């Protein structure tokens, strides 16, 4: 059989519209930091996928911000917040109290299927209010069971808000809603690679500080501009309805002038993709929490693993805690955009991702 020579783009240059992880890959290869990589093919129109060929003849696929290190079944499982928490609880790991409820259209679809028509355990969103009455009190968080970057995560305070949120989920064809207790603890992201804690930071929700001169809306727009200038890809228009709802809870409107030094939290979520601010904690995190993150990465067989952790005091070992989510493709673009030190640290980590075929 004739041996074909691979047609690899050995001199592909980074481009602004390429996925940030692929640009880092290309920069590292061009700089000679990946001596085992023979060549890289990048789909040029969108720059969202890449094929790496190593000198051993092995290949690796990069898909968006997924470096191609984790097993597909593990990645699929942790995309589902309900399944993830089932596994965590079986291992004695604390998670927020909560349960899953199928949206009516999806519940009807399953109940009519050949296999699930015998399942008596299917519960739909008509049962969510009764569950809250029995198990917890408002406010609660309602979120799509599958999703990322905090999209759709809503803090609800009343039965009417619950009904409104679930109705919007139904319109968006969300299949499963997760209802969870609200936690009054700081929120952290811990990143593990091959059993090593390589990054850890506190996530603080998007907020502004008043100057006594400008309206809240003007300050929000200024903050948005600052984030964009930092390279943060923040879609503020998607957050605006949630900002208005949170302000309304405290008797505020976007047109109000924020008092001098008045700090106003704008969102109930702290995701960096929603404008949250990271605070590095690598020097203060207690080893107990690094060990917990490593244990979770092992449970799910994830070489790259992001653990979202609520913890009362991350500097001590016996603090109250709860694991909020596990991520198999924890994007770090937002953290990298916050400073040169963070960029250098994460770039070195990403180079490690690509050094060897597996």
Language-model region placement:
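A short beta-strand motif that forms the metal-chelation/ATP-contact edge
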Residues: 50-60, 189-193, 197-199, 315-334
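Active-site nucleotide/adenylate-binding loops and adjacent lid/helix of ATP-dependent enzymes
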Residues: 63-64, 74-236, 287-290
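A short, surface-exposed helix-loop junction/capping segment
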Residues: 2-12, 64-67, 146-149, 255-278
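Oxyanion-binding "anion nests"
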Residues: 218-265
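Conserved beta-strand edge residues that scaffold enzyme active sites
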Residues: 44-46, 102-103, 204, 311
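Residue-level detector of anion-binding/catalytic polar loops
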Residues: 34-38, 94, 196, 303
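ATP-binding N-terminal substructure of ATP-dependent carboxylate-amine bond-forming enzymes
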Residues: 1-90, 107-110
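C-terminal active-site "lid" helix and adjoining low-complexity regulatory extension at the edge
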Residues: 247, 274-291, 297-304, 311-358
């Amino acid at each position: 059989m004739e041996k074909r020579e691979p047609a690899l783009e050995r001199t592909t240059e980074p481009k602004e519209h390429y996925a940030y992880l692929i640009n880092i890959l290309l920069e590292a290869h061009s700089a000679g930091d990946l001596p085992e990589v023979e060549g890289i093919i990048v789909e040029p129109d969108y720059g969202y996928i890449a094929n790496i060929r190593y000198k051993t003849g092995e290949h690796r696929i990069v898909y968006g911000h997924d470096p191609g290190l984790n097993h597909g079944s593990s990645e699929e499982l942790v995309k589902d917040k309900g399944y993830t928490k089932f596994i965590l609880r079986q291992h004695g790991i604390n998670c927020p109290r909560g349960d899953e409820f199928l949206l009516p259209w999806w519940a009807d679809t399953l109940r009519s299927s050949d296999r699930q028509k015998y399942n008596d355990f299917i519960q739909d969103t008509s049962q969510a209010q009764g569950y809250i009455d029995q198990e917890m009190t408002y406010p609660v968080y309602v979120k799509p069971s599958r999703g990322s970057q905090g999209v759709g995560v809503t803090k609800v305070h009343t039965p009417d808000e619950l009904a409104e949120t679930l109705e919007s989920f139904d319109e968006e064809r969300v299949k499963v809603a997760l209802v969870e207790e609200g936690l009054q603890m700081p929120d952290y992201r811990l990143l593990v690679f091959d059993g090593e804690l390589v990054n850890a930071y506190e996530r603080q929700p998007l907020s502004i500080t008043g100057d006594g001169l400008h309206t809240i809306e003007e300050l929000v727009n200024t903050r948005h501009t600052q984030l964009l200038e930092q390279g943060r890809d923040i879609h503020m228009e998607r957050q605006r309805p949630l900002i208005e709802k949170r302000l309304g809870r405290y008797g505020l409107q976007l047109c109000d002038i924020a008092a001098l030094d008045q700090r106003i939290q704008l969102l109930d979520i702290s995701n960096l993709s929603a404008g949250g601010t990271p605070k590095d904690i690598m020097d203060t995190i207690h080893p107990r929490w690094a060990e917990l993150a490593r244990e979770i990465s092992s449970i799910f067989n994830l070489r790259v693993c992001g653990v979202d952790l609520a913890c009362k005091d991350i500097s001590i070992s016996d603090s109250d805690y709860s694991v909020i989510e596990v991520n198999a493709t924890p994007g770090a673009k937002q953290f990298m955009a916050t400073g040169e030190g963070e960029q250098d640290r994460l770039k070195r980590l990403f180079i490690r991702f690509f050094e060897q075929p597996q």
